[in-house]
Amino acid sequence: MGLPLTFDDNNQCLLLLDSDIFTSIEAKDDIWLLNGMIIPLSPVCGDSIWRQIMVINGELAANNEGTLAYIDAAETLLFIHAITDLTNIYHIISQLESFVNKQEALKNILQEYAKV
């Protein structure tokens, strides 16, 4: 990604990529927890987007690529994934790049469903 990572006092690093891809990294004792904002989402939006979210969540789980989670207080859909192997910097960079690419793809797909 070519970006320096700076963590705050809460062990979090916030990244804004391409002006609309927001990702946070939370460094815990033995994992990095990645959170990527996908779309703002009202709990009363149509059924088709919730069905699509469940389909995508199943695919993510089957491929061990993370999960989608709805944050009620913020009315936001997040993409969440944990990096569990912190021993290899190249693996970490690869996982971060894969996460951001998947986040962008999910955002593009689900934005279309949110418009319907």
Swiss-Prot record:
Gene3D superfamilies xref list: 3.30.1460.10
Keyword check for Chaperone: yes
Cellular localisation: Cytoplasm
Gene Ontology cellular-component terms listed: cytoplasm
InterPro entries documented for this protein: SicP
Broad class of the protein's primary localization: cytoplasm
Sorted UniProt keywords: Chaperone, Cytoplasm, Virulence
GO biological process, one term: protein secretion by the type III secretion system
The keyword Chaperone appears for this protein: yes
Purpose of the protein: Molecular chaperone required for SptP stabilization and secretion.
Protein family (similarity comment): Belongs to the SicP family.
This protein's name: Chaperone protein SicP
Protein's organism: Salmonella paratyphi A (strain ATCC 9150 / SARB42)
Gene field: sicP
